[in-house]
Amino acid sequence: MSKIRVAVIGAGGKMGTRTSRNLAAMPEKYELYCVEAAPKAAESVMARGLALYSAEQALAAAQVVIFAVPDTLIKKLSAIYVPMLQPGTGFLILDPAAAVARELSLREDCTFGVAHPCHPSFLKDQDTPEARADRFGGEGGHQDTVMSKIQGDDAVFALMQQTAKDMYRADNAFVMTSEQIAFLEPTLVELLGATCLYAMAETVDKAMEKGIPKEAAVSFLCGHIYNLTSNFLGYLEGRPPVSDACKVAIGLGNKMVLRDDWKRIWEDEVLAQVIHTMLHPDAEDAIRVELPDNPAIPIR
């Protein structure tokens, strides 16, 4: 069986490093062409023992292209790289925002898709110390990936699916539309999930102000998150009901913590506004937001 020829554009960035490292670990299956323009990032690629190629060399050879560049640069950079593709190439971006916003350059003779990692879940059987220590995925932790075919050939997309599963070390590749992936991220895991989790982390700070040791607050919070998440999502056998007092507390939290109309985040026009603001935060019609600034909590 011949090897799959894969080009990774941005191979020295965060996602480019993770994906190229995993594909490079399967030399019997993949012929890898790493492209990196930033000097320091290029040095990191070579330090891992991988060869660097020009974009022209890589795209002339590649069957599948992994476009590991920042979301905010996809519009600009895809306009440069997509015209260089060979007919029949599969082109994968790693986030749906630019596709949903129609900022990704396309070609009729190529196949385009999205592949985004789910990250290792505490509901999966993370059965080794390495798996349990892997927070991002691809380094021992069991995770899945979500994918969409924006346009193109089914056979090429099947090749892209296999490549995505290998580069993320994913157990499953769940295929859906790009819009559905966008409702997963940003809507589900960032607009709601990350916001709530950020508030929980800030609440640990408040617990410490009350004299509660951080270790106790974190253990108490994370244990309850595991228990309640498992229960509410149907992964706790028998789905035992929470206490009446907890039900009252949830009702109070809905009034004191969440906006009454928070489920509007699942409306199409809200998603469009959110994606536009995330890709173009300085645009005149972007939603004005106050960024979180707690120095104890890292924000990329």
Tell what function each PLM region has.
Residues 194-208, 227-233:
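C-terminal alpha-helical interaction appendages
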